Each structure stands twice: as C-alpha cells, then as structure tokens.
Amino acid sequence: MSPRPLAWALVLLGAALAVALALGSAPAPGAREKLCGHHFVRALVRVCGGPRWSSEDGRRVAGGDRELLQWLEGRHLHGQVSDGDPMLVLVPQALPQASLHHHHRRAAATNPAHYCCLSGCSRQDLLTLCPH
C-alpha cells in the first residue's frame, strides 16, 4: 500500500473520530444536570438572560448572586405581606419531632435550588424559574 492512500485514510479517520467525540460529549437538550450553589445561579442567569442579572460587557452586576438567591427564596415578598395585612403574617409554630423530617423533605421539594442540586434540572426546568 502506498503512503498516499494511507495518509488520506488517517486524515479521514481522525476527522470521523473528532466528529464522534464532539457529538458524544454534547449533553442532550432535555438532559438533567445537577447544579449546586453558584453553578445553579450562573446557569439560571445564562438561561434567563435578564439585563439585571447578566451584563453584556462582563462587568459584575450590583447585587449579583445574592439578589437572585433572595428572589428564589421569596424574601422579597416577606415585607410586602406583613405591610399589607397583619392577618397574613405567618407565626412559626413548633413541629413535633416525628414530622420534622417530613417537613424538611417537603420544604426541599419546593425549593428549586435544592431540587436542582439533588435531582438535577434541565434547561426547560430553569426557564420556568425566570421572573419574566
């Protein structure tokens, strides 16, 4: 076998291998990815693309991750509820020890950041969390 066809065969094999690796390593569009802490926040900012959360020129946005986490935890609503109607203010009540575990599990299920960390979130899941 002459060196010329062998060289072409190696070039074609290398190109095919590169394409196969590129396609194999790309996550599927609906794939779930475990996102914890700042990885969750950054993925949410990237998906939502809000001008208050991501800057075009790379400058850090005032409030940054802290503002987004507070929004996700619903802290922005606490003052509004107590100012509007005193009957709506929730008074914490002691839970019996037996139901404490179930309460924690139920709270974790409703916290999107905790859910994405434990079970993973798809891009579509993150889009449902966008405020706009």
From Swiss-Prot:
Location in the cell: Secreted
Superkingdom of the source species: Eukaryota
One GO cellular component term: extracellular space
Assembly mode: Heterodimer of a B chain and an A chain linked by two disulfide bonds.
GO MF: hormone activity
Function: Seems to play a role in testicular function. May be a trophic hormone with a role in testicular descent in fetal life. Is a ligand for LGR8 receptor.
Propeptide: 61-104
Family: Belongs to the insulin family.
GO biological process, one term: adenylate cyclase-inhibiting G protein-coupled receptor signaling pathway
Disulfide bonds: 36-117, 48-130, 116-121
Protein name: Insulin-like 3
Signal peptide: 1-24
Tissues expressing the protein: More strongly expressed in testis than in ovary.
Keyword Signal in record: yes
Keywords assigned by UniProt, alphabetized: Cleavage on pair of basic residues, Disulfide bond, Hormone, Secreted, Signal
UniProt-listed InterPro entries: INSL3/INSL4, Insulin-like, Insulin-like_sf, Insulin_CS
